[in-house]
From Swiss-Prot:
Tissue expression from the record: In third-instar larvae, detected in most cells of the optic lobes, showing an enrichment in the lamina and the medulla neuropil. At pupal stage, expressed in photoreceptor cells, as well as in the postsynaptic cells that form the lamina plexus and medulla. Also expressed in salivary glands and pupal eye imaginal disks.
InterPro entries associated with the record: Ric1 (IPR040096), RIC1_C (IPR009771), WD40/YVTN_repeat-like_dom_sf (IPR015943), WD40_repeat_dom_sf (IPR036322)
Domain of life assignment: Eukaryota
Biased composition (Basic and acidic residues): 1419-1429
Name under which the protein is recorded: Guanine nucleotide exchange factor subunit Rich
Any one of the GO CC terms: Golgi apparatus
Residues bearing the modification Phosphoserine: S1207, S1391, S1394
Family designation: Belongs to the RIC1 family.
Membrane-related topology note: Multi-pass membrane protein
Localization, UniProt: Golgi apparatus membrane
Length: 1429
């Protein structure tokens, strides 16, 4: 839980002006003063800021007599130092403090006003003491001193070359005369004490031969909590020396040889966890614990780097150093390299994985060859002495660290946030930010994917990004850190941070430094400090810090009252003692924690006190002691208690009603890594001493949920054991039916089963700092490095260390352990509580993948394979098929036979996907089939899936399937598959067809960007004005997808070839589905299909214009479009007026007005106020199209009159625009803007394909009069009588349906279409010489190619112009004017201009004769039977 940040800095600890190398560094007990030793000098430095205080240089005579300096040892009170020299002598130095209290720094501002300090950071408020260093004496014993260590406040322990241990008093050294050989005050002859070897825990220790004659102690370290010393002898044997009492006499001492360690090089002791670490010449480190039963050594774990490390490349271990809190072990090797390990063996950092650049060989020339390590204040800095000093450069490096708040404040395990603390700053990563922001509740995640049955075209924004953010899990959360700098006013005198805490909501943080307290609000982004600085200096936080319901609670020591206290301060008030609450306790507080409304406190006298907390008001708090427990019997010393908490973890084992749900009954204590559970019985008096149950060992940190909700993941105890991985202690519950029967039958029956809990263990890839119970995720931090400069002379040549937040899912680990122990029901219940998580399928996939990899690659036979049980378990969930295929796709093909031999054949699984409508999963199985089956099988199943995907409108899937089918080589249809997986998503694009196709780029079905000025790319190959026989030869069909052919050959002939029938016809499938969509009036789906699948809609519609694109019921088609688009009903059932009544009222109503229909293009809907909406598109006007048609042709064409465009007297139709209309008659804009854009695009495609029926319906839906005008003019120019009759019938049918329903949406718009009906009637009646039977026989095969000019020769010679007779009762009748030989002949290219008037070329006015009227009435009677209305 320690992580380096920034660059390793070079610091100069030599004498000012010199660059001598430093041989040893040692900090005092409180890590404030740093002693640096060179060959001939001793320097004392202040830790922060790192400045020198005192120096002492030895004389030449002293160097010749005693040799150079080797190492330095501080006295615990920081007043004396013992210096060991190369000759084995001991020099004693005294450190004196100045009595005047003045510091060594005098801050004087310059006289210039511009240079005076204004900012707070420019003032050094720390009073750095003035010290003086002097040599007291030198001690030379009868034997050479090899090493020295301090064992108490007053004693030193010396090891000599004669294999003895000497115990000396500091005071005796002080009063000794110079150069006096002192006799041993207390001598321990190690060759006379027994040494034992305990190879197995159950074996008794046996005596072994004594030490070798020439061996002596080379390395020694003492710990009062283990009652002995860790020692390494000169012959590389490691031992543990223990004494029965503190006098260290030969008769009361014995030793244990460390088993399996024959090449020891260095040793170190962890006081808090009572661990002994021994470094070996093989570059490994072995760690041992003390067995409380026998007092011997018990192997704990081994530290060794194996990843990317060559054997024997590191060399021997030359330094081991535990951090001040015992949470981290720093290891260095002789060949270079530094690593950090957690207490029980989890690797936190290794410089061998750092990026030193390409020019650095870490094996031969490692830049970090270190010989000494020393931790600075609170473990925030690590001093490193390089083995080979560089010329004119300091050999001391300082590496900065941040550490988890759990290291000093274990009660932070209940927080869902990662909080790291530096010496003057905090790093915060809030673990549940996305939960609270986007999900709206704790532990709930929005779905990351669309539903299986969600329609892609269900809304108008289907091709756009969703408005609301979707996140799959907390894994996608931002990994940036929130860095909070400590206020300068507080950090200047209270550096460094000792404790840090954050509330469960992540809104408030509290920090405690050397004295006082400060807290920060993430809402207001402001720090709160004590207004009275003296109150801040009056107490020291010593036992922990936590938040409870808006109060910050701490254990502290009052410097003013000399008492130990519990203090509480509200967050909403200013920091002042008048708002705080104080409770005096009997001894210093070591640790504290909370459970709901209870506070548990451990004091230095070994008493655990439980307090009940309650809020009187927003600013007042009451604390009452509930009971006390004596825990001295379960620990060597209270300082060995790492953490503790109180919980109701085992409430389910008690009969209901014995204890309340909020009442805690269990105390969990971590003593030297052993988890002890103290069960409280509320029915009896609590004894003073308790028997504890050991749940686990080698535990660094544990987590418990304090939530009121009960679930499988919250009723567990989570433990982390370093190299042993993660552990979980969870209850084993019976099935639900048996559980209910047990509750009814009494607690005894239920207790027989429920008294069992199980401890499961599994590995983790990161060090867990936060456990999110509901999300089955652990959060942690990993170190990475970045190289900024590759120059050796640069200050930035060393890598820059950074931190990154990591996460890992552990659900599959727990499920596998439960299934392995035949606890499938418990695993199923746990999985059911997590199945709502978006990454639950991924967890099942990891579960299957781990078992498959382990069993399929095993070289030994597996007697009890776990894969069948895992498959049976996954089969209980609906994601079974998806889990199988996703696991297979991420596994080597060589393992597939083993997987599918137990999971089922891929063909059967594919069929199951189709039956359950899991089409995306079925598509993934095609990859499996392609590699395990012949290509013809995968092609058959892909075609089947393509057909189903089209039916269910899965356009993306259909697109991938088409690419998959096109990627299959036709030559491999019958050949066995090779071991190569072709991904559906990355299948190669189809080969370019040699046939000339229509340019689709400019007309892509873009539903989002809106209308764009389209190229007339289809007009070059699809022309609606050509006769059908010409179109058939000039319009290419849909291009084939499997093979190419010549450009001139029709595509239909190719698709009907024998070879193509043997393969899968993609085009036929697409055309068949497009035909079904068109017949069902699913125009939007047809548009999506063409957009996603690159289907050539215009060319296909040209072929289907007289088949699938032909409508019989226009009103029904319009009704179906409304239903598809979720629009209001166009023809409501309730109606009072029929079409006849409306038509009669129109004939009797007079008035005049001008048309509001313009020639602007798409947006030309008539509005009541006369304004017309104009289209941004630039389309060719109708007049330009007519001018293009004014070319010499076989048809007689009449010229228009100058100054007038009117050829019909449509006075009666002009009155339609001036009729009084109600609100229901007005045109209502019922289409959203984006939907309107899509429909207009479809309309243009239908017009280009000459599909007049659907073009007419779309124009009605869009209420676009200009489009209808263009359609009518195009029909007239096509000279197709049958099409004219169909269009006239369609308009009348729509008009009848509209006026039969009074609430129709198109009532007002249909009124504007009557001139178009009138124009079609006039044109049809103009063909009066054609018999009715001949006109009726004009079928689909001849409507575009029929030549009606022969039948009209007589009429063209007699009739000059037609003028409607407005006085006749029937407005649909024609009257023929007087014939004039000079009149122009009738042209069939009449058009309707923007004002709605019928325009036909006309000459001078004339009167019709009775002969002409009779001829007109006769022709009218003959065509009466041909009319549709």
């Amino acid at each position: 839980m320690y992580y380096p940040v920034g660059w390793p800095k070079r610091v100069g600890l030599a004498l000012p002006g010199e660059s001598a190398s430093i041989r040893h560094i040692c900090c005092d007990a409180v890590k404030i003063l740093v002693a640096a030793v060179g060959d001939d000098f001793l320097g004392i430095w202040y830790a922060n800021p790192l400045i020198p205080i005192a120096y002492f240089r030895r004389t030449e005579d002293s160097l010749r007599q005693y040799g150079a300096n080797q190492l330095i040892v501080w006295k615990p009170d920081s007043r004396q130092l013992a210096l060991l020299t190369a000759s084995g002598s001991l020099l004693l130095y005294q450190l004196d403090f100045e009595a005047n209290g003045m510091g060594i720094l005098q801050q004087i501002d310059p006289p210039a006003a511009s240079l005076k300090r204004d900012s707070a950071e420019l003032f050094i408020k720390e009073n750095i003491p003035r010290l003086s260093l002097r040599e007291l004496c030198s001690v030379t014993l009868g034997s050479v001193i090899t090493t020295v260590c301090c064992i108490s406040l007053s004693e030193l322990l010396l090891a000599t070359q004669s294999c003895e241990l000497l115990r000396l008093q500091w005071t005796e050294l002080e009063h000794a005369e110079n150069d006096l050989e002192l006799p041993a005050l207390s001598s321990i002859k190690l060759r006379d004490i027994p040494f034992y070897v305990q190879q197995q825990p159950q074996q008794s220790a046996r005596n072994v031969p004594p030490l070798n004659r020439d061996s002596y102690v080379a390395s020694l370290e003492y710990s009062p909590f283990i009652g002995g010393c860790a020692a390494v002898f000169s012959d590389r044997r490691a031992a543990f020396l223990i004494a029965n009492h503190l006098r260290f006499e030969t008769d009361h001492m014995h030793g244990f040889w460390v088993p399996d360690v024959e090449d020891a090089s260095v040793c170190s002791v962890n006081h808090k966890f009572r661990l002994l670490a021994y470094g070996q010449e093989s570059s490994a480190v072995k760690v041992y614990a003390i067995d409380d039963a026998t007092g011997g050594l018990e192997f704990s774990h081994r530290l060794i780097l194996t990843e990317n490390i060559l054997p024997d490349s590191l060399g021997s271990v030359n330094e081991l150093k535990w951090s001040p809190d015992g949470c981290v072990l720093a290891v260095s090797w002789t060949n270079g390299g530094l690593s950090l390990w957690s207490t029980f063996g989890a690797l936190l950092m290794s410089t061998l994985s750092w990026d030193f650049g390409l020019n650095v060989d870490l094996v031969c020339q490692n830049p970090l060859k270190i010989r000494r390590l020393e931790w600075s204040t609170e473990g925030y800095q690590l001093f490193m002495l390089k083995l080979h000093p560089e010329k004119d450069k300091s050999n001391v490096l300082q590496l900065q660290f941040v550490k988890s708040a759990l290291s000093m404040n274990p009660c932070m395990t209940t927080s869902p946030h990662i909080l790291l603390q530096g010496d003057d700053c905090l790093y915060l990563n809030q673990g549940n930010n996305l939960e609270l922001t986007y999900a709206g509740s704790h532990g709930t995640f929005p779905s990351s994917g669309l539903g299986s049955d969600e329609d892609i075209s269900g809304d108008g924004d289907c091709l756009e990004l969703k408005q609301s953010p979707h996140t799959g899990s907390i894994l996608t959360e931002s990994k940036y850190w929130t860095v909070l700098q400590l206020p300068l006013n507080y950090a200047a005198t209270n550096w460094p941070i000792r404790y840090a805490a954050i509330d469960p909501d992540g809104l408030h943080l509290a920090v405690a430094g050397r004295t006082g307290l400060a807290h920060y609000s993430l809402v207001t982004r402001r720090w709160k400090l004590f207004g009275n600085e003296s109150q801040e200096k009056d107490f020291v936080v010593s036992g922990g810090l936590l938040w409870w319901h808006g109060f910050v609670v701490m254990g502290c020591y009052s410097l003013l009252d000399r008492t130990d206290e519990l203090r509480c301060y509200p967050a909403d008030c200013k920091l002042d003692n008048q708002y705080g609450h104080k409770l005096q306790v009997r001894a210093p507080v070591i640790s504290l924690n909370s459970f709901r409304h209870q506070l548990i406190v451990l004091t230095a006298d070994g008493i655990v006190s439980l307090f009940n907390m309650s809020k009187n008001s927003a600013y007042a708090l009451d604390i009452e002691c509930a009971y006390e427990l004596d825990v001295k019997s379960i620990c060597i010393h209270p300082a060995c208690i790492v953490s503790l908490t109180v919980t109701n973890l085992k409430n389910e084992l008690k009969p209901q009603g014995q204890l309340g749900g909020d009442q805690a009954e269990t105390i969990i204590v971590n003593v030297c890594g052993r988890i002890l559970m103290i069960q409280r019985d509320a029915g009896e008096q609590v004894p003073n001493t308790l028997l504890a149950t050991c749940l686990a060992s080698c535990v660094e940190v544990f987590w418990l949920s304090h939530s009121l909700e009960r679930c499988a993941m919250r009723d567990c105890l989570w433990l982390y054991s370093g190299a042993h991985g993660m552990r979980v202690w969870l209850p084993i519950l019976p099935p639900g039916r048996e559980r209910r029967e047990g509750e009814q039958g009494g607690a005894q029956r239920l207790h027989s089963f429920m008294s069992k809990r199980i401890m499961l263990s599994f590995p983790l890839k990161l060090y867990p700092l936060v456990v999110l119970f509901d999300n089955v995720i652990v959060l942690g931090v990993e170190n990475e490095s970045t190289l900024y400069a590759n120059e050796q002379v640069s200050h930035f040549s060393l890598p820059f260390a950074v931190m990154e937040r990591k996460s890992q899912i552990y659900l599959h680990k727990v499920l596998r352990q439960l299934i392995k122990r035949n606890l499938g029901y418990s695993a199923w219940e746990m999985a059911q509580s997590c199945c709502s998580l978006p990454y639950f399928p991924h967890a099942l996939e990891l579960l299957l993948h781990e078992v498959l990899e382990e069993e399929a690659t095993s070289k030994q036979p597996i007697p009890d394979a776990q894969l069948p049980s895992i498959l049976d378990f996954i089969r209980e969930f609906p994601v079974y098929l998806e889990t199988i295929v996703q696991c297979a796709r991420k596994t080597e093909i060589a393992l597939w036979p083993y997987l599918f031999s137990m999971a089922g054949k891929p063909k059967d699984l594919f069929q199951m996907c189709l039956q359950s409508e899991q089409l995306d999963t079925a598509a993934s199985y095609l990859i499996i089939l392609q590699n395990l089956e012949p290509s013809v099988v995968s092609k058959q199943y892909a075609t089947m899936l393509l057909d189903i995907a089209l039916q269910q409108r899965k356009w993306e899937l259909a697109k991938d399937l088409i690419r998959f089918l096109k990627a299959i080589d036709p030559n491999e249809i019958d050949s066995p598959r090779s071991s190569m997986v072709v991904n559906v998503k990355i299948a190669p694009p189809p080969q370019v067809n040699t046939q000339q196709q229509v340019n689709q780029n400019a007309d892509a079905f873009n539903m989002v960007l809106g209308p764009i000025a389209r190229e007339r790319s289809f007009s070059t190959t699809v022309t609606s004005n050509l006769p059908k026989d010409k179109q058939a030869s000039g319009t290419p069909g849909v291009a084939p997808v499997t093979e190419s052919s010549s450009a001139g050959a029709p595509s239909v002939v190719r698709r009907r070839s024998t070879k193509q029938r043997e393969t899968f016809c993609i085009d036929l499938i697409l055309q068949r589905h497009a035909r079904q969509l068109l017949q069902n009036h699913k125009l939007m789906d047809l548009g999506y299909m063409c957009a996603y699948l690159d289907f050539h809609l215009v060319s296909w519609l040209s072929q289907e214009s007289e088949r699938a694109a032909k409508l019989d019921d226009f009103a029904g088609a319009l009704q179906a479009l409304h239903e598809e688009l979720d629009l209001p009903i166009p023809f409501p059932t309730a109606a009072k007026d029929d079409f006849a009544q409306i038509r009669g009222s129109l004939r009797q109503t007079g008035g005049g007005g001008s048309s509001q229909t313009s020639e602007s293009g798409y947006f030309s809907l008539a509005t009541p106020n006369g304004a017309a909406t104009q289209s941004p598109q630039l389309q060719p006007s109708i007049r330009e199209e007519e001018e293009e048609l004014q070319q010499p042709s076989s048809l007689p064409i009449l010229k228009t009159r100058s100054g007038s465009q009117l050829s019909f007297d449509n006075f009666r139709y002009r009155r339609l625009y001036s009729l009084p209309t109600s609100e229901d008659d007005l045109a209502v804009d019922i289409l959203p803007q984006k939907l309107s854009i899509k429909l207009r695009y479809l309309l243009q495609l239908f017009i280009e394909a000459n599909c007049t029926d659907y073009a007419l319906v779309l124009s009605i839906l869009l209420q676009d009069a200009a489009s209808i005008s263009r359609i009518v003019n195009g029909i007239i120019r096509s000279e197709s009588v049958h099409t004219c009759r169909r269009t006239e019938s369609a308009l009348k049918q729509l008009s009848q349906s509209t006026f039969e329903h009074s609430g129709s949406l198109y009532r007002g718009f249909v009124l504007t279409l009557q001139p178009h009906v009138y124009l079609l009637e006039q044109y049809i009646q103009s063909l009066g010489d054609a018999p009715c039977s001949q006109l009726q026989d004009a079928g689909p095969g001849t409507e575009q190619g029929v030549d009606v000019s022969t039948g009209l020769q007589g009429l063209q010679n007699e009739v000059g112009e037609f003028v409607p007779n407005s006085q006749q009762a029937n407005g649909n009748q024609w009257t023929v004017a007087d014939l004039n030989p000079n009149h122009q002949r009738l042209t069939r290219h009449a058009s309707l201009e923007s004002n709605g008037n019928a325009v036909v070329a006309s000459g001078s006015s004339a009167h019709s004769t009775p002969t002409q009227r009779q001829l007109s009435r006769q022709n009218s009677r003959e065509r009466e039977g041909c009319r549709l209305m």
